Each structure stands twice: as C-alpha cells, then as structure tokens.
C-alpha cells in the first residue's frame, strides 16, 4: 500500500553523486506531471505519489521533486530535509546480499529468505516509487527491472515487491506464483495493494511488502486459496479497512525471457457484495482451474495428439472436399476404383498427397 510517512534514511544518490550507478535500459524523459504513469494507482488513498521514470542515476528533477514531497508530508518538514541534505557526513547504507538457493533448503526456508531480503531493502515511504513498473510490459522486461532492484538496493513498494518476488523464485518449478490485488475502503478513500500469491505442495502463502506486517507475507500453511484470502480480509479489518474487490491473476511462467505479460486479474470478485460461502465457492473453483492448467498445456497444444485423431493443423487441408461430394459422382463407373487408388496416396497421418 502506498504511504505518506517519509523514511529519509535510505534515499538514493542524485545524478552524478555516485559514478557506479547503472543507467536503466528503459529510461525515458521525466514527465512534469505528478502522475507517474505507472500501472499502480498514482493516487492511492487520496495521497499522490510519484514514479521515477528517468532510470538511474536519478536525474535532478526527480531528485528535487522527491525532497519537496517529503518536506510536505513529514512532521518536521523542511527542517528535517535540510538537516539531511546539508549534513557534512552521512553513513553509507548497507547493501544486502541477494539470497541464493541451496539444495539443503526447504521451500518454506527459501521463501522466508526472499522475504527477509525484501524487508532488508525496507518499505519505501518517500512518496517516489524508484522503479517504474508497467504491468503490460513483457515478463522479460520486468525481470530486467527486478535485476536493477538488486543492483540499486533501494526501498520498494508492494508492486515492485511482486516483480522482485517473481524474479527470485524463478527456476523453482514446484513454486507457482500469481498476483493477488486488493481494493479497500477506509475513511472516505480507496486504497490499492498487491501481493504475490504462492502455491506449493498443496499449500498457499504469499510474499510482498507493506507498511503493515499482516498485509505482506503469509506462511505457506493455508490449505485453500479462500483461506489465504480470508486471512488477508481479517487482517484488513484490524485496521478498519473494508475489502471491496479482490483480483487474482494466473500463474506466472518460470521463463524469464518470455514476451508474455503477466495476467493480473483473471478473476475479479466484488467481495463486499458477496457472502463468504459464495466467495469460497468461486475461489476454490478458480484454484482448481489454475491447477488443471499446470497439467494440461503440454497435452492441450500437442500437435502429435491432434494429428493422431486424423485432424489437420493446416486450414487449407481442413477445407478439403467432404466425402459427400464423392457421392454426387457415383454415376461414373471408374469412381470406386479411383477411390481405392487414392487411399494409397494417404500418408500415415491421413493427409492426401495431390499431384
């Protein structure tokens, strides 16, 4: 969820302050508008936030805009900003080590290591999202952004955490990942949040980042998808938030070079207008469908199976004359012999060779 409190202890260096910073491969000119253009809401809970579109190193416009926003929303305002920016010495922030999977680790331990890494990066309270996430971008491009997150080691928000979680869990086929989005209502405003749902060995859990510990990672202990969603809903109630909508996407493929975008909202539930029994029914049906899709893709699109049924993959051959047209020419005495001869020209998959 987006927040308005400022955390000024983990701020990036401005352009030119650190020569080793990498330039983003998808950098674009900065817009002067407050809207960042990211797929994540630019105004969440009535609070505007900005998106860094200049890549790294951060340009002067984005840098100054961030500090102006912090000065407006922080309780000590400009005094605090001036104390930091005019300080003669600032401690160098530590760069956490990216977790590495070891064969001795269990899946829950590996997921916990990933979540601990995200927590070390910290949640971004500056009001400026450092990494632009365009939801319709191909998965390969989003994985490049995730690599950039590990290089820059800056605080992240919920949407960035989902992309980073996908990147760090790649190569573990037993772990299925899918996005879960929430739209909630509190004190006259709507809020948006997203986490990365996890399914492994018949259990559900999640990875993510939030200002609230109960609204990010969940242990891999939930037997059903509905149990996981209801646990999030109960956590929201602790903060007097009413969950209005829940959106669930499809499993994200374990192919970092895929040009396929992430499916963010395959299932949309207006949970505020539904009974829990109906919500559970819809969620469990959807969960079964997702699990079946894991088992079916290889067979559902297999050319071998389609051909074994005598069906052609070619549209032209599928339009061949039906047997009924042969019946119209039964007057010709040579037709039956010709038909037998034609059968010898069929290959093993039922295609007729025409000369």
Swiss-Prot record:
Coiled coil: none annotated. Pfam families: Vasohibin (PF14822). This is Tubulinyl-Tyr carboxypeptidase 2. It catalyses: C-terminal L-alpha-aminoacyl-L-glutamyl-L-glutamyl-L-tyrosyl-[tubulin] + H2O = C-terminal L-alpha-aminoacyl-L-glutamyl-L-glutamyl-[tubulin] + L-tyrosine. Tyrosine carboxypeptidase that removes the C-terminal tyrosine residue of alpha-tubulin, thereby regulating microtubule dynamics and function. Critical for spindle function and accurate chromosome segregation during mitosis since microtubule detyronisation regulates mitotic spindle length and postioning. Acts as an activator of angiogenesis: expressed in infiltrating mononuclear cells in the sprouting front to promote angiogenesis. Plays a role in axon formation. One of its GO terms (cellular component) is cytosol. Residues 11-26, 308-319 have a biased composition (Basic residues). It is an enzyme of class 3 (hydrolase). One of its GO terms (biological process) is positive regulation of endothelial cell proliferation. GO terms for molecular function: actin binding; metallocarboxypeptidase activity; microtubule binding; tubulin-tyrosine carboxypeptidase. The modification Phosphoserine is found at residue 302. Changing residue 157 to A: Reduced tyrosine carboxypeptidase activity. Belongs to the transglutaminase-like superfamily. Vasohibin family. Changing residue 211 to A/H: Reduced tyrosine carboxypeptidase activity. Interacts with SVBP; interaction enhances VASH2 tyrosine carboxypeptidase activity. Changing residue 158 to A: Abolished tyrosine carboxypeptidase activity. No effect on binding to microtubule. The active site is at residues 158, 193, 210. Keywords: Carboxypeptidase, Cytoplasm, Cytoskeleton, Hydrolase, Phosphoprotein, Protease, Secreted. Its EC number is 3.4.17.17. It is found in: Cytoplasm; Secreted; Cytoplasm, Cytoskeleton. It comes from Homo sapiens (Human).
């Amino acid at each position: 969820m987006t927040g308005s409190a400022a955390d000024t202890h983990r701020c990036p260096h401005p352009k030119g302050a650190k020569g080793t910073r990498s330039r983003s491969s998808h950098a674009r000119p900065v817009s002067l508008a407050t809207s960042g253009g990211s797929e994540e809401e630019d105004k969440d809970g009535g609070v505007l936030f900005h998106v860094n579109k200049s890549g790294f190193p951060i340009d002067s416009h984005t840098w100054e805009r961030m500090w102006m926003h912090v000065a407006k929303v922080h309780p000590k305002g400009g005094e605090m900003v001036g104390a930091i920016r005019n300080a003669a010495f600032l401690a160098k922030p530590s760069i956490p080590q990216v977790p590495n999977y070891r064969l001795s680790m269990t899946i829950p331990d590996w997921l916990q290591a990933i979540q601990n890494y995200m927590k070390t990066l910290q949640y971004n309270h500056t009001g400026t999202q450092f990494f632009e996430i365009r939801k319709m971008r191909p998965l390969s491009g989003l994985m490049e952004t995730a690599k950039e997150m590990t290089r820059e080691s800056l605080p992240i928000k919920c949407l960035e955490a989902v992309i980073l979680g996908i990147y760090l869990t790649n190569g573990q086929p037993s772990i299925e990942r899918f996005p879960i989005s929430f739209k909630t209502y509190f004190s006259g405003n709507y809020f948006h949040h997203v986490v990365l749902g996890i399914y492994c060995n018949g259990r559900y859990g999640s990875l993510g980042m939030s200002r609230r510990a109960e609204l990010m990672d969940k242990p891999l202990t939930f037997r059903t998808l509905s149990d996981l969603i209801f646990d999030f809903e109960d956590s929201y109630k602790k903060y007097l938030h009413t969950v209005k909508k829940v959106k669930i996407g499809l499993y994200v493929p374990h192919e970092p070079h895929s040009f396929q975008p992430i499916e963010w909202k395959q299932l949309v539930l207006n949970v505020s207008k539904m009974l829990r029994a109906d919500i559970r029914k819809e969620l469990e049906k959807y969960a079964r469908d997702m699990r079946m899709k894991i088992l079916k893709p290889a067979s559902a699109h297999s050319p071998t199976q389609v051909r074994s049924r005598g069906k052609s993959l070619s549209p032209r051959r599928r339009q061949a004359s039906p047997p009924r047209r042969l019946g119209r020419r039964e007057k010709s005495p040579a037709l039956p012999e010709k038909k037998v001869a034609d059968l010898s020209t069929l290959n093993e998959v039922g295609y007729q060779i025409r000369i």
